[in-house]
Structures are given as C-alpha cells and as structure tokens.
Amino acid sequence: MADLQKIVDDLSALTVLEAAELAKLLEEKWGVSAAAAVAVAAPGAGGAAAAPAEEKTEFTVVLASAGDKKIEVIKEVRAITGLGLKEAKDLVEGAPKPVKEGVNKDEAEKIKGQLEKAGAKVELK
C-alpha cells in the first residue's frame, strides 16, 4: 500500500508537460489511445429527447498563440503553472497548447485575462 501512495505522490508532483509526456509514454507502452477511451466513455448521440446541456464547470485554458510579446507570455505561463523556464518556453513556442486543465470558470477567466494582458491569444474549452 505504501508503494501505491508513493506513486500517487509522484504523479501529483508532475507538471502539466510531464503529465502529458507520461500519458504519451503509457499509450505507446500499452498500445492504447487516450482519445479512444474518451470516445468510448462519451454518451451516445441522443437526439432531441436528450437532457438539456448542463453548464460547463471545468475548463481548459488553451494558449492559442503567444503574439508579439513572447517573453512576457513565458513569464506569465511560468507564474501560472509553476513550470521552469525551458518548459514554459517550450509550451509557449508549441502553441496551441493547454496551459491549465480542469479549472473552474472564475479561475479560467482570471488566467485568460493574465495571459491576454501579457499579449497572448487564449481560448477556453
């Protein structure tokens, strides 16, 4: 049981980029695709009788582009995510990329405002 707790602690300490890399490695190792699992878990097409769509409660903040002030955007990404300089630079240069996932609407709007103030183009998904 202590081994499982250590794994949980180690996974919790990963940055967003490290978690994404881990997901890719596990997909390759196990021969699966995370996208396929999401498609299977998604509800089937329901037609008009489906329940009304609920308001989204979790958002992903996606950096669409860094704009002209790339250095300012990198600084803001570091402040928001806690990433190191190289990881933040790679994230910004690899746009479009998710900056923060699974955040509530208020936090997503706040992060979007911070990044846009720094000169980035941002989307909420």
Swiss-Prot record:
GO terms for biological process: translation. InterPro entries: Ribosomal_bL12, Ribosomal_bL12_C, Ribosomal_bL12_C/ClpS-like, Ribosomal_bL12_oligo, Ribosomal_bL12_oligo_N_sf. Keywords: Ribonucleoprotein, Ribosomal protein. The keyword Ribosomal protein applies. GO terms for cellular component: cytosolic large ribosomal subunit. It holds the Pfam family Ribosomal_L12_N. It comes from the Bacteria. GO terms for molecular function: mRNA binding; structural constituent of ribosome. PANTHER family: 39S RIBOSOMAL PROTEIN L12, LARGE RIBOSOMAL SUBUNIT PROTEIN BL12M. Belongs to the bacterial ribosomal protein bL12 family. Homodimer. Part of the ribosomal stalk of the 50S ribosomal subunit. Forms a multimeric L10(L12)X complex, where L10 forms an elongated spine to which 2 to 4 L12 dimers bind in a sequential fashion. Binds GTP-bound translation factors. Forms part of the ribosomal stalk which helps the ribosome interact with GTP-bound translation factors. Is thus essential for accurate translation. NCBIfam families: L12. This is Large ribosomal subunit protein bL12. It comes from Bradyrhizobium sp. (strain BTAi1 / ATCC BAA-1182). The gene is rplL.
